[in-house]
């Protein structure tokens, strides 16, 4: 049993866990019924620990005989009316987040005890003999943890030891707080052995360079601790190996990532040519935006620009300093990405536009971006994220920025000269490659590399990242691999990402662990959950109403099963989910249901001709009788009645005749075996969407979009179509939708073409079991 909304095809060529085909809907309906009926709040954690995007958990079993309507709509009105209090909370959260986005400056970031200690170790450059930044020592003394250590709330041995060594050295150097030093030394003694077993993937950036100098400093200060553990010896060996690989001439002449960890060369300071290195300073006076590296440079040179950078930080953060600053581009790009993936970006469109304008101002089509503006060094992580969010928000960016990261073997490195790969950075490269345009070969190669890398890591159960400790990175990667962006419906993606997003519990791995509160924010998560549940309650109410429409029209008597009705409504709700788009959503679902009903009639050629004659006659009679078609054909009458109500309920202008014209084109194509479904759905969405443009249908770009979308959806029905052709057409459609030009169509109108194409792709890509699981999660399983 297949639904004409999509195709019943089997094509092993296209990627995914199953061949592209439409699911058998009766099996799907029984599965959804069972899971919806068996769901309870105690099972709300289902899917949070793994992707589950295409394979439901063990709790999902097939049963028969349950009444889906009864199990899912009881108490819906009560839920809707009880959300009045949540609306106030939603409004409060929206205003709070808008304030965050409007006031973004250099970037919000947690303090680094390690970097603060390096700044605290700087002696008065005027020769006073004391610390030049005494407030840093106050910060250190005020931020010691109960166990005697310094560091992030997440206990990571690398992080706690490097922070604690640095802080106890700073305090001991200035003979301050001996009691705090004693507690810190006790912590070090008790935890040094844990270096032996810590996972290397959790080792902070440059740890093998930055930790040994602290160990040697501590020894010179007669701080006693065990220094013969296998883990420590291994770190020293890694340092020796890295030193042998350092291109000393290059690091003195061009900016490299070594500038970020210059303090790690404190034991070999005599090999550093500061006259050359200071020429590589960032415009703000820092060494690659690192307070610790800049503090070491200030110790060695007394440079005025280094001093000014550190003075600004100490004053800005009241004595503490972060491990990286500024991070203005990173904060804006990542925050926008999080809001979009959580499904709440519509509340912040003006603020997102400003964030994107800011990032685009510093974007280089040749080099990409780094976390901070004006950087002479770029990385693939920030470049990938910046590229994706800029392109999806309509900004002109070139993929040439990725060329510098590709090596001779076709692998993509995060930094030029890097020797190992990051899961999260490669994941973001993969996500950037998803939005490629036709002919962008560098992105095609990036997609090939990143797909294989991530698939291999998943197969080996090695989706542990060296740059971030997040709630469910394996789930994020799994979803992206299993559900390609072309097939990812907005509400499905939001549902999974809300469960994967860690909020303020996420820690990033720099030289120490750090937090980015404007990227990982509990308010984002709370708003996403509230909004999701509010939308879901409305969707459940609509599902009840569309069932009543189905019964009143007698569509069951024409062979339309309730399973097909559910699938039609789910696809519409998962694609066009916003409360204010209820009319569009219902119009799409009803149109799809009617199309399914008509095409399942198995009519002869003559019967089809009679149907069209009734349709044409009904149009004439409707015009003559003021809206009453007067036809004897029940299905034709249902079309006219439904179209009439759509026109009354969903638009500020009269769209009745335009909707009927769209239907007329469809029935004419249907009579001769044509395929006009996609065009009918697009026209229905755009007409019921209340476009401010009364006649966009004559626009040249509208016709282009319609042609490509129709071709894509038609291909997804053919069993012989090549994957490369579908991908090429999807790339062309994405380009038409996201690029802007003078005299262009409204972006909301263009997006509807992509919405329809992605819905066809989704239905062809995902298995019956997966779609059933998604229906439950999107429509019936409440977020807690």
UniProtKB/Swiss-Prot annotation:
Cofactor section: Mg(2+)
Q: Where is this motif: DXDD motif?
A: 379-382
InterPro entries, per database record: Isoprenoid_synthase_dom_sf, Terpene_synth_N, Terpene_synth_N_sf, Terpene_synthase-like, Terpenoid_cyclase/PrenylTrfase
Instruction: State the pathway, as annotated in the record.
Output: Plant hormone biosynthesis; gibberellin biosynthesis; Secondary metabolite biosynthesis; terpenoid biosynthesis
SUPFAM superfamilies named in the record? Terpenoid cyclases/Protein prenyltransferases (SSF48239), Terpenoid synthases (SSF48576)
Q: Which EC number(s) are documented for this chain? A: 4.2.-.-
What is an example of a Pfam family matching this protein? Terpene_synth
Q: Name one GO cellular component term.
A: chloroplast
- Where found? Plastid, Chloroplast
Q: What is the extent of the transit peptide? A: 1-57
- GO molecular function annotations of the record: magnesium ion binding; terpene synthase activity
User: What span is annotated as the signal peptide, if there is one?
Assistant: none
Q: Which GO terms describe its biological process?
A: gibberellin biosynthetic process
Which residues are Mg(2+)-binding? Answer: 379, 381
Residues that bind substrate:
242, 466
The record's listing under PANTHER family reads: ENT-COPALYL DIPHOSPHATE SYNTHASE, CHLOROPLASTIC
What is its biological role?
Involved in the biosynthesis of labdane-type diterpenoid including marrubiin and other labdane-related furanoid diterpenoids with potential applications as anti-diabetics, analgesics or vasorelaxants. May be involved in the conversion of geranylgeranyl diphosphate (GGPP) to ent-copalyl diphosphate (ent-CPP) and 8-hydroxycopalyl diphosphate (LPP, labda-13-en-8-ol diphosphate).
Q: Which protein family is it in? A: Belongs to the terpene synthase family.
Domain topic, free-text comment: The Asp-Xaa-Asp-Asp (DXDD) motif is important for the catalytic activity, presumably through binding to Mg(2+).
What is this protein called in UniProt? ent-copalyl diphosphate synthase 2, chloroplastic
Q: Which gene encodes it?
A: CPS2
């Amino acid at each position: 049993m297949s639904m004409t909304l999509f195709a019943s095809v089997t094509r092993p060529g296209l990627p995914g866990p199953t061949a592209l085909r439409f699911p058998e809907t009766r099996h799907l309906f029984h599965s959804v019924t069972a899971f919806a009926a068996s769901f309870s709040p105690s099972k709300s954690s289902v899917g949070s620990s793994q992707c589950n995007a295409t394979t439901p958990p063990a709790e999902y079993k097939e049963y028969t005989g349950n009444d889906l309507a009864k199990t899912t709509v009881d108490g819906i009105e009560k839920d809707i009316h009880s959300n009045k209090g949540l609306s106030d909370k939603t409004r409060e959260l929206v205003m709070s987040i808008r304030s965050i986005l409007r006031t973004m400056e250099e970037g919000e970031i947690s303090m680094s005890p390690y970097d603060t200690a390096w700044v605290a170790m700087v002696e008065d450059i005027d020769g006073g003999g004391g610390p030049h930044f005494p407030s840093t020592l106050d910060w250190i003394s005020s931020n010691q943890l109960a166990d005697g250590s310094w560091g992030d709330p997440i206990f990571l041995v690398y992080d706690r030891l490097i922070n604690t060594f640095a802080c106890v050295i700073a305090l001991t150097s200035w003979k301050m707080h001996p009691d705090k030093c004693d507690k810190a030394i006790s912590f070090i003694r008790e935890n040094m052995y844990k270096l032996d077993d810590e996972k290397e993937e959790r080792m902070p950036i440059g740890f093998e360079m930055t930790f040994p100098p602290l160990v040697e400093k501590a020894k010179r200060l007669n701080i006693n601790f065990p220094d013969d553990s296998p883990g420590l010896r291994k770190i020293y060996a890694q340092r020796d190996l890295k030193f042998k690989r350092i291109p000393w001439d290059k690091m003195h002449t061009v900016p490299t990532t070594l500038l970020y960890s210059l303090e790690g060369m404190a034991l070999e300071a005599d090999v550093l040519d500061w006259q050359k290195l200071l020429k590589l300073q960032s415009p703000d006076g820092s060494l690659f935006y690192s307070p610790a590296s800049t503090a070491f440079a200030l110790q060695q040179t007394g440079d005025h620009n280094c001093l000014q950078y550190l003075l600004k930080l100490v004053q800005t953060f009241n004595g503490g300093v972060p491990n990286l600053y500024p991070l203005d581009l990173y904060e804006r790009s990542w925050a926008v990405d999080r809001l979009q993936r959580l499904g709440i970006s519509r509340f912040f469109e003006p603020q997102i536009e400003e964030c994107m304008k800011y990032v685009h101002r510093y974007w280089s089509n040749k080099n990409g971006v780094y976390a901070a503006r004006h950087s002479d060094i770029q990385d693939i992580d920030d470049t990938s994220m910046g590229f994706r969010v800029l392109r999806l928000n309509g900004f002109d960016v070139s993929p040439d920025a990725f060329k510098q990261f590709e090596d001779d073997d076709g692998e993509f490195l995060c930094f030029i000269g890097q020797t190992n790969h990051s899961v999260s950075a490669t994941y973001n490269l993969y996500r950037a490659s998803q939005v490629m345009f036709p002919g962008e070969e560098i992105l095609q190669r990036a997609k090939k590399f990143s797909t294989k890398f991530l698939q291999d890591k998943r197969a080996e159960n090695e989706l542990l990242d060296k740059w971030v400790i997040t709630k469910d990175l394996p789930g994020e990667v799994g979803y992206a691999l299993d559900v390609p962006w072309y097939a990812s419906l907005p509400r499905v993606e939001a549902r999974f990402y809300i469960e994967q997003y860690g909020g303020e519990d996420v820690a990033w791995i720099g030289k120490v662990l750090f937090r980015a509160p404007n990227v990982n924010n509990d308010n984002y998560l709370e708003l996403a959950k509230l909004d999701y549940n509010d939308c879901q309650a409305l969707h459940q109410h609509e599902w009840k109403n569309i069932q009543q429409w189905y019964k009143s029209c007698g569509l069951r008597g024409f062979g339309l099963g309730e399973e097909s009705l559910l699938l039609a409504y789910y696809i519409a709700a998962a694609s066009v989910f916003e409360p204010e788009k209820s009319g569009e959503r219902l119009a799409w679902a009803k149109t799809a249901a009617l199309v399914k009903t008509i095409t399942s009639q198995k009519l002869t050629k003559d019967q089809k001709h009679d149907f069209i004659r009734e349709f044409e006659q009904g149009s004439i009679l409707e015009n003559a009788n003021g809206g009453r078609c007067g036809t004897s054909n029940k299905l034709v009458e249902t079309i006219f009645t439904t179209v009439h109500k759509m026109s009354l309920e969903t638009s500020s202008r009269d769209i009745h005749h335009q909707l009927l014209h769209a239907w007329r084109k469809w029935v004419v194509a249907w009579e001769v075996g044509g395929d006009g479904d996609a065009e009918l759905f697009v026209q229905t969405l755009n007409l019921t969407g209340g476009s401010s443009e009364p006649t966009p249908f004559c626009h040249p770009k509208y016709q282009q979009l319609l042609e490509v979308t129709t071709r894509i959806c038609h291909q997804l029905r053919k069993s012989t179509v090549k994957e490369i052709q579908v991908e090429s057409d999807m790339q062309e459609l994405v380009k038409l939708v996201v690029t802007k030009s003078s005299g262009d169509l409204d972006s909301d109108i263009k997006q509807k073409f992509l919405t329809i194409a992605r819905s066809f792709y989704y239905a062809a890509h995902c298995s019956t079991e997966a779609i059933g699981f998604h229906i439950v999660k999107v429509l019936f399983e409440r977020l807690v």
